[in-house]
Amino acid sequence: MVAAIYDWSGFYIGANGGWGSSHKCWDVTNFPRATVVPIFREGCHDATGGVVGGQIGYRWQSAGWVFGLEAQGDWADLNGSNVSGFIRNWTNNSKIEAFGLFTGQVGYAWNNVLWYVKGGAAVTDDKYRGTVTATGALFDSASETRWGGVVGTGLEFGFAPNWSVAVEYDHLFMGNHSRSFTSTGVLGAAVVPVGGVFRTDSIRQDVDLITARINYRFNWGGPVVGKY
């Protein structure tokens, strides 16, 4: 009797979707046009929501070991806010609109079941807003493309010769960045002109992601191996 050996080698493309949470802590360092000493903690919040996107990669298998490279890009809707601990009439808002992961993988396969770990670079598209707590009026804003690192792990199941599904967890280490916020003039253009720097904040960020994935592997020229 011949038992098929599942082959994880080859190029693959797929889709993913799930949930994310970005933990951000804000410290004001400049307000307005004056250095804040000591740095004043504005507080933290979790920006949560859904993610959906795709991935493309290549894997090669040696005995039970599986190695790979992958690029992933997702749209995101991770939103959160907190009332500032610096001035209570301010609310700090954040949103991640997209992210990308560029990783290497190492895993071990038990026939059509693959467990893997991954690590590499991460990038996020971040938007920040300051609003009046009572009215929601926008008084300043900032944005950035932030680079950091990612580690993750996943469990994948091959349910057909070229198809597999997986569940994956990733943690993004996005570090601490300083951002200057542009004034809208809502709190008084005489204090800070429209378009001027209203304040500067140091913002720390980490992101956690849980996604379900489906992949199609092309496996060009790779026949199914059998064993007796």
Segments (PLM) and residue ranges:
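Gram-negative outer-membrane beta-barrel domains
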Residues: M1-Y228
